[in-house]
Amino acid sequence: MKIKIALFITALLGSTLAVSRVHADMQDDVDRAVSIIERFSEIPETAIPPAVMRDAKAVAILTVTKAGFVLSGRGGTGVVIARTEKGWSGPSAIGTGGLGLGFQAGVQVSEYVIILNTQEAVNSFAKGNNVTLGGNLSAAIGPIGRSAEAAVAPQAALYTYSRSQGIFAGVSLEGTVIATRYQQNEEYYGKPAFPSDIFSGDIKPPSGAQKLLDVLSKY
């Protein structure tokens, strides 16, 4: 019985990671991030308030795939970009993954935008260590729409936004662990690229990141 369970988990993780590998190329993640930011800004009633974007110290954008039945596997990739004195930094590759319990039949793809509201949050990502949402840093579902424009100071270090199958929903990411993908950074920049060096602006963003920087520069 134990062998069957082990084989099931292995197969489950394999299928989830196989889907994740579709997004393994960092340029794909960068291009996808552009589309995600645009989608999260389309409808005023469900959009991330411009004020939240303007005050953001950094922005993380992820595409996460969940697959399985009873036991579910989750894997996702994306990028995080920090605000500098001269604009926005280049992107740093990130990823997440794990197992969960509960009814999860088939495959579900979700998009997430995480707003980093504090310098402490940026520093946590800059160190290149694993970041646990709601653990290392307080996280809350972010405000949406025009009514949130008048919001005062952020209520958490991180604001999270999610979109699944075309529907915007407030989904807590508490407990999610996000890790730096060092190999993807090195391949994208053509040399070892530590998150802190990317966020400081010391490493020039590749030309492929320009469209993402242009979209974010509106805020």
Where are these regions (language model features)?
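C-terminal segment of classical bacterial N-terminal signal peptides
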Residues: 13-21
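N-terminal hydrophobic alpha-helix used for membrane targeting or insertion
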Residues: 9-14, 107
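Small-residue-enriched, tightly packed secondary-structure blocks
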Residues: 23-219
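Bacterial N-terminal signal peptides that target proteins for export
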Residues: 1-8
